[in-house]
Amino acid sequence: MTIAAGSDDNRQRRAALLLLACLAVLALQILVLHLMGRLWICECGYIKLWEGVAKSSGNSQHVSDWYTPSHIIHGFLFYGLGHLLMRGKPLSGRLLLATVIESAWEILENTPMVINRYRSATISLDYFGDSILNSTMDTLAMATGFLIASRLPVAVTVAIAIALELFTGFMVRDNLTLNVLMLVWPMDAVKAWQAG
């Protein structure tokens, strides 16, 4: 075996371990959400691939919904963050950083403090937290966005993010930008517009 071949084997082994670490973080997220008392699936008792009604008790309970694009954009942003902070490090290491951040958010988002904040400051009056299925899929959507961003030119990734924001903003009067704005600095005018 040559030195180059040994080096490639080490890189592949390290990448595999980092990907396993990503799965371990996701498993830990699932365990913590379970210990927090989150439901595995929608209280309705069935699973939908798509929940198209944003202002419903089924939102954030199924495989995907109008907030899935926000999690894809998280992946775009976390790829950029990893590129800045971990330049020269393996893609799998940057994905691990992104997975840790997203999983931490998914856990925080499902605490009573954040659920109550959503209900008091935003139009999400029917929001009672995510099902474990939905939260897991949100993290996988982030990973998908991360991998998309790793393959596309920056300009294309930015264009996709803007298109997703405009589309969801038009369709349901909510998106990642408005979600962050209303959580951090609620505005009555925005809340009234979102209420339709």
From Swiss-Prot:
GO cellular component, one term: plasma membrane
Record's keyword terms, sorted: Cell membrane, Membrane, Transmembrane, Transmembrane helix
Transmembrane stretches, start-end: 16-36, 66-86, 152-172
Superkingdom of the source species: Bacteria
InterPro entries: DUF2585
Localization per record: Cell membrane
Chief place where the protein resides: membrane
Membrane topology recorded in Swiss-Prot or TrEMBL: Multi-pass membrane protein
NCBIfam families in alphabetical order: PRK00944.1
Record-stated family: Belongs to the UPF0314 family.
HAMAP family xref list: UPF0314
Protein name: UPF0314 protein Smed_3089
Biological source species: Sinorhizobium medicae (strain WSM419) (Ensifer medicae)
Lineage start: Bacteria, Pseudomonadati, Pseudomonadota, Alphaproteobacteria, Hyphomicrobiales
